[in-house]
Structure formats: C-alpha cells, structure tokens
Amino acid sequence: MEKMTIRDVDLKGKRVIMRVDFNVPVKDGVVQDDTRIRAALPTIKYALEQGAKVILLSHLGRPKGEPSPEFSLAPVAKRLSELLGKEVKFVPAVVGDEVKKAVEELKEGEVLLLENTRFHPGETKNDPELAKFWASLADIHVNDAFGTAHRAHASNVGIAQFIPSVAGFLMEKEIKFLSKVTYNPEKPYVVVLGGAKVSDKIGVITNLMEKADRILIGGAMMFTFLKALGKEVGSSRVEEDKIDLAKELLEKAKEKGVEIVLPVDAVIAQKIEPGVEKKVVRIDDGIPEGWMGLDIGPETIELFKQKLSDAKTVVWNGPMGVFEIDDFAEGTKQVALAIAALTEKGAITVVGGGDSAAAVNKFGLEDKFSHVSTGGGASLEFLEGKELPGIASIADKKKITRKLILAGNWKMHKTISEAKKFVSLLVNELHDVKEFEIVVCPPFTALSEVGEILSGRNIKLGAQNVFYEDQGAFTGEISPLMLQEIGVEYVIVGHSERRRIFKEDDEFINRKVKAVLEKGMTPILCVGETLEEREKGLTFCVVEKQVREGFYGLDKEEAKRVVIAYEPVWAIGTGRVATPQQAQEVHAFIRKLLSEMYDEETAGSIRILYGGSIKPDNFLGLIVQKDIDGGLVGGASLKESFIELARIMRGVIS
C-alpha cells in the first residue's frame, strides 16, 4: 500500500492538525518514559520547518469520555516543549471557543497541544460532529499515531471524512516495514511468537503461515501447544478451550510445509516472584504439578538461535517469558540478541509493539532492529492481514493510469498585456512540470500572443469556445480552423455558462465536439447538474443525457480523445464545492456509463476532470479520488494560486 505522506503536501502557512500518540506513563505530573513523544518529533519538526501551524491531538490512558486530572496532557506539553526547545502552547479543552481562539492566534512555526481527546465521549465513538469540529480547525490532517491505527476514532479516522489525511513519518515507517514482512518477505522468513495467549495470536499464525518458513513459539502460549501434543505442563498457564485449535494449527502447518518449533526445555517456578526457587526441566520429562513454566530454557535458547541463523526476514511479537522479572528474562534477552545480530548481517527484523517493545527497551536494544513498532494491538492486526481503519483513512498515492490535466479557464478576464504577463509567470514557475499536462484558456483576444509565449513550452494553449463550421456568415464566432492555426490544442465546449446564458443544447455541443476532433484538437466537454436538479435527485439522469448526446456518433478512437469536465453548476463561482465523495460518485458514474457506451478499455482511457470552485484548500481531497483526473479551474486559475494547485497535483502523483 502506498499512502500519501506529509512530504507530498505544501505546508507553508497551512493549519495542520496532527494525530500523535502521546499515551505515555505520567507520575506526579512528570512523564516517566518519553519514547513515544520522541518518536513523533521528526514529523512535528518537519511541519514546523515547512512553516505550518501545528495543532496536536492525542489521547492518554482511558478517562471514559470525561475530564480526569490524572490523564491530562499538561505534563506532556511541558516535556514536548523541552524536547523541541520551544514553547508548546496548551489548551485544557478539546472543543469550544477556547480552542478556536487558540488556533486563530497560532502563527507559522508554532505548536498547540489540545487536551486529551478521550475527555470527550465522541472520540471513541467516532462522532462525526466532533470530527467535523476538529477538521474545521485545519487545512490538512496528518496521522502519525500508528498505535491507534486499529481503532476508528474521531481524531484519526473521523477527521479524514472532512479534510485530506496524510501519513506522518512514523506512520510511514510502520506501514513500510510491516507491509514488507506481511506481504513481501525475503526468504528464509522466521516468525517468533510469545506472550500469554494463543487466542491473541491466532490471526497472526494463520496469516503468516502462508508465507513463513518457520514459526518459533515461546512465552506462556507455548504450553497450550505442548498440552495439545500430550505433554505434562504442570500448573503452567494453558487456554483449555484453545487446545483443539492448537492441534489444528499444528496440522495446518504440517500440510503447508511450515516448521513449527516448540521449546524443548523450560525454566519453572512455583510463584511468579523475584528470588524464588527455580529450575530447568526438559519438556519431555514433564513439568511437575504446582510448578509453572515462566521462561524458555537454555537448550531452547540454542535451538531458537540455530533456527534463526539463516533468516533474511524476522518478525518477533511477544516475550519468551516473564521478562519483567530478571530471573525469567534470559530467554527473551537471548532471542532479542540473536535477532539483533541478524540485523547487522542485513536481515529485515521487525519487533511488534507492546511487551516485545518494552523488552527491547529493557535490554537497551531499541536501535538494533530494522524497526520496533510503536503499536501493540495495531501491529498484531496488521500482521493478521486486516485493514486498519486508521491507515485506510489516509489518502492513497494516486496510481496514475491516465495523464492528469490541470486546466485554467480564464473566462472573460485579463487584457492582452495582463495575459502575457501572467502566462510568463506560469512558464517561469512551472517550466519543469512533466508529470501532468497544464492547459491555459485565455480570452480569444489574447490567444495569439499567449500562444507565442507558450510555443515549445510544456504548458498547452486552450480556447474557451468554438463554432462548428470552418467559415461562413456567423458574425462574432471563431472557427476550429482559426484555432488550429493559432496553435490551440484544447477547446472547452458545453460549459454550463454557455448552456445557461447562450442556450446551447446537447445537439449543438455535439457538433462542436466533432468539429474540434476533426481538426486534431482535444475537446473538453463540460457536463453537470444545477442545484435544483441535484435536490430533485436528477444528477445522474442529467449527466447521462449530456454525456450520451455529447459523444453521439463518436467511435472508440474518437471517444478516447475527448476530455470530460464534470462541473456541478451549483458549485461554479458560488464558493461552494462538491465534497470529494460527491465528486467521486459522479466521476465513477460517468466512467461506468462510458464502459456501457463503449467498453472498459475505452472508458479507462478517457480523462474526467472536476470543475467547480477549485481552490488550493480543497483540491487535494478531490485530486486523490480514483476517478478524478485533474481540474478545470476558474477563478483560482487567474492568480498565483494556480501555481499552488500544480504543486498539489505534483505531490499526489506516485
């Protein structure tokens, strides 16, 4: 999966609301472990360096949807200020006028941390009104909280319904490494699993069994498997209701040729306490009643090391024993050291979050692995192959199958001198754009002189209208032949203003489309519904009629040369804009319609632009949609904002 990241968007002067994971231990108002805060620093610093106004959201603990002083983020704000070397403003609220005022006063390069998101009951319920409020504070959402990626909450998933969401650097790294080991691991691939419950790891074992060469099982969960094999496990922790499942997993592994490696000895004791009597027993000899296995034994450590020795990819999730107590930590420590040694040899080594990450930190090995995940439950669900809502809500990098177009319709604006001056600026600023097409459509009076400036450049010349005859007694009209001679490559036909003001109908527009194609130019056929038609539920009917009649008489090859611009009439020049979801819905409908009229290959070749009050602050959410191939821009194409739109489009191209 390739997601958009914070690098792909222009942050200068933007309000960025960033979901981070500051769920850290706090005692007596002091942060005890700042690992998670440090993990978010690269993303925060980058946003500040780019001139963003940064608003941070995080939860801490489980305050049950209401303010609770012991879960306040005030101590986190203090620690973050120390780590950043600059003031972090803190608002002891998550919604309301106090929050709005603090955001309004925020300057470029400043940071604001809101109070614990879980002080509001709507956070964990993914309340759309709460998400909408947070979204209203910002231009873009950055999700850098992998630890909550398996939760659909308002601060990580809900906001993305209202403003574009991109990944921070930590989220990007998590996705990169976990995707590698889940979907495309280098062989030999060894999975090391531990922890208490088989039930917690069923999904991981089942999914990774399709790819792993060996699965090494330690921790308390090993005793459920050992009992399934008929071994005596004494008072060791066993999930009795999962014994049959353990048998099934062992059988399934055998069928798939995956080696399941279980411990051959264990460190046992009668109590889980420091300093108690302990001893090592072989599994085949059985663990006496009243004794429980609390760590893997020395023979198992050597066995696991040997099974790991040739690995090119290793995933480790779950400790080998009760590592929190030094008497039972050796197995976990030795396995950690063995995996760390493989990292030095070039293997990809990934440590799941939760207890595994805590163990790595205890042994001072946190920088000895390719990646140590910051999410326990999230990393487990990712390894199970599940789609995590906190990742699904991040905008995908656009997979380009059609060359995108950014077209500017200047309408009845700019004199010849103004047009020449502005197009010269565009040429200077956008001269290196090759990834997509840029088209400018000045008034007819400026076409020739603008065309001379654009000659041989990467920016294409377009016209705003045309008549369908080459010549004749048509006072005031411009013919396709005239446009062709000037060097025009694109021609807008059927714009809603011409349909409405000049009463152009579909038959008339169809004749224009054919005339433009005949002269080797590309028509941009505009379609779209009025507000009244939308409110009556007629959007698809109106658009279907306009598309069918606009394409009437065109064969497949001619159809492929037409560009469609969906412009909801109610959004043109009104400041209103279709939501990304509304726009995508109509674009998808048009593409499906084209496949019915022609075939899927033809429909997949035709570019469909969106037009309707496009501006830099709404363009990203539109352009990342699957079926939107660019924009036909009105007012924003007359100013330097057109350059910003081009930068936004550049950022989304994979």
Swiss-Prot record:
The entry lists its GO molecular-function terms as:
ADP binding; ATP binding; phosphoglycerate kinase activity; triose-phosphate isomerase activity
Q: Which domain of life is it from?
A: Bacteria
* Chain residue ranges for the region called Triosephosphate isomerase: 400-654
Q: Which residues bind ATP?
A: 201, 293, 317, 324, 353-356
The cross-references to Pfam families, in alphabetical order and at most eight, read: PGK (PF00162), TIM (PF00121)
Where do the record's region annotations for Phosphoglycerate kinase lie?
A: 1-399
Q: What is its EC number?
A: 2.7.2.3, 5.3.1.1
The record, for CDD domains, names: Phosphoglycerate_kinase (cd00318), TIM (cd00311)
Question: What is the reaction catalyzed?
Answer: (2R)-3-phosphoglycerate + ATP = (2R)-3-phospho-glyceroyl phosphate + ADP; D-glyceraldehyde 3-phosphate = dihydroxyacetone phosphate
Which compartments does it reside in?
Cytoplasm
Write down what this protein is called. Bifunctional PGK/TIM
